[in-house]
Amino acid sequence: MIALDPTPDRDAHGRDGTGRRWTPGARLVGDEPEVEPADGAPTVGVLALQGDVLEHLRALRRCGARAVEVRTPAELDTVEGIVLPGGESTTIGKLLERSGLLEPLRERIRAGLPAFGTCAGMILLSAELAQDRVQPLLGLLGVRTRRNAYGRQVDSFDVALDVTGIDGGPVDVSFIRAPRVEEVLSDDVEVLAEVDGHPVVVRQGRILAAAFHPEVTGDDRLHRSFVALVSSTRD
């Protein structure tokens, strides 16, 4: 069963009564000591053009990966896996084009680079959008995705979600202006979790995508699963 946690009272800008901007799960994400990765740890990049970069870096490091920011094709060449974070998918897509990263990123993922897209990252990976909207997409994941399917920032909510392949009970995640999969377009896509009958976690080969923000709740199991995937694909 999916459990929804109420969010604190806040205004239209997401600020609570203290004037601070509220993000679901943010209470669990704070300053953490740097952890030196073990010898032989996989190098996992986080696309760092816009969006929720720092929390992904921290989660990956807690999972034992050597986590680095990726902003250029040269930096992309150094990683063994890539996380596409939440943020604003149109902005990230345009910055991918402007930075010269769009085609190199598409080709590396197509060639087998493990990729994990969350929220906006899922949108970028998708083959199609449900809305009539022109924006850059990588087009590698066989799904049709609807942007902002769960409402605006003020409609954000937390979920305890059962995810196929993740042990230890439901995973705590946050839906923040989240997309959802409207239609699976390929038999190669495996649905790992649903909300109200719509897929919200899918996998296609070495591509993992989630409609929510797993990085802000402190539950690192999806990141740990992705780091394990990256490690398993090494020569």
Question: Model-found features: residue ranges?
Answer:
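Short coil/turn connectors at secondary-structure junctions
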Residues: A41, V79, A111-L113, Q135-P136, ...
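Amide-donor transfer/coupling interface in amidating biosynthetic enzymes
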Residues: M1-V35, R147-D235
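Redox-cofactor binding/interface segments in oxidoreductases and associated redox assembly factors
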Residues: L84, G117, A210
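Cofactor-binding loop segments of dinucleotide-utilizing enzymes, especially the Rossmann-like FAD-
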Residues: L49, A120, F212
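N-terminal beta1-alpha1 cap of cysteine-dependent amidohydrolase-like domains
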Residues: M1-R98, E103-R108, D220-D235
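Flexible, glycine-rich phosphate/dinucleotide-binding loops
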Residues: V53, L76, L124, Q131, ...
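Hydrophobic anchor at the start of a short beta-strand
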Residues: A67-V68, A115, I207
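Cysteine-nucleophile active-site neighborhood
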Residues: E88-D162
